[in-house]
Amino acid sequence: MLENNLKQWFGHESFHPGQKEVIESVLQGNHTLGVLPTGSGKSLCYQFPTYMQQKPTLIISPLISLMDDQVMQLKSQGERRVVCIHSGMDEQEKKENINVLNQSRFIFLSPEFILQSHHFNLIKNIPFGLVVLDEAHCLSDWGYDFRPHYALIGQITHHFKLATILALTATAPPHLTSDLEHILKVKLNTIQTTMNRKNISLSHFNFKDDDEKIEWLLKFIESSGPTIIYVSSKKICLQLAKLIYQHGYLTGIYHGDLTYQERQTVQNQFINNFIPVIVATSAFGMGVNKKDIRTVIHFHLSSSPSNYLQEIGRAGRDGKQSQAISLYQPDDAYILETLLFNDAIVSEDVETFELGAFLPPNKEEILTVLHQNYTFKELKHIFKTSYIRKQAGYQRIIGYTRIDQCRRKFLLEFFGESPNQSNECCDNDSDLSKIECYNRKKVKRQFTFNEKIKNLFRV
């Protein structure tokens, strides 16, 4: 029965592992957490029940690029009753999309948008059959001290009492189910496959300084194929992209300060192979579905094992052999520690907030949002727990740079998973084949990097 509909609606002969089990759970009315690896077709898990039940679906999504990609995918399948509203749109486009909300089958919104009362009023009477929390690990990873509105999503799901909740992610630490159940105030049926992407080999290189890293990188990208290079800051993003461009390769930049239109331009040029290399902060993360990315390089370490698996999961979505490579020099530990802990909210900040004493504006804003739903005692416990988890993630990522055991096993055991060793596994236990996918130099005349950026964005 389900396979017949799969063929009719999506043109597929069979489900990927985990898809059918998640769909069956949802169709039985169970609130469900689906943990499926990156690139395994998680969006089918909500599209299929939507067509089956003939009721509208609300998808709460963390990133604009992720929403746009899924809307584009649905429209390419012939679906016209799909709409999203986000901060990258101009007012006219927002108005047009608001006008068709009640006629739409798939509605994509951010938590910040939907939790504003005048926006919530636009959808509160829509009879949703399904409420989807996409990239659900973000509720646990981001939902307290980065995107605090995530921790209030339970207000939305509680309103739509007749809707089934479906949370989807590719990375699930052992505490994720209990975190989500606490936020949503429901019991979840957890269906978990593997987080392991066997077609992505893992390698790591240690250097004495950034100059050594850059020298290695400029040589390596000659044959790395379509490549994302992750860095820790906008400043390094611009500097590294400029060096790669001067080396002869058209290079895109992607960071949080770009406008929505600029991000779209870079993504489209990368997806359509006009540029072979993107240098990005983690803002590039989850939203681009380019299937033939061969290489993901972390010039700086990722902020957690969960983020690392998400970021390397951009590679090899066509099923072909791909590679994830991390680079490290001694100063990088300080960079990561600063990013993770310098502005982290701790229980002492909650006490200060409770007393009405001065706090930095960003911390005060976050605690003000969260205090709508949580007592001071609960907030102290939340941030104490969050700090301990960050410390554990930090130690695991730093440990990754020092180990001589299987890298895949070391990463996945953090999530309670014990993978079987595969060919092309990692540099510690396999003789990895070199991926030869040459990036042709395309810089014909010597534009400056700034001229190239101006041409790219037409400024």
What positions do the PLM features span?
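Helicase motor core with emphasis on the C-terminal RecA-like subdomain
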Residues: 2-45, 49-55, 60, 65-108, ...
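C-terminal helicase lobe
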Residues: 228, 234-236, 249, 268-275, ...
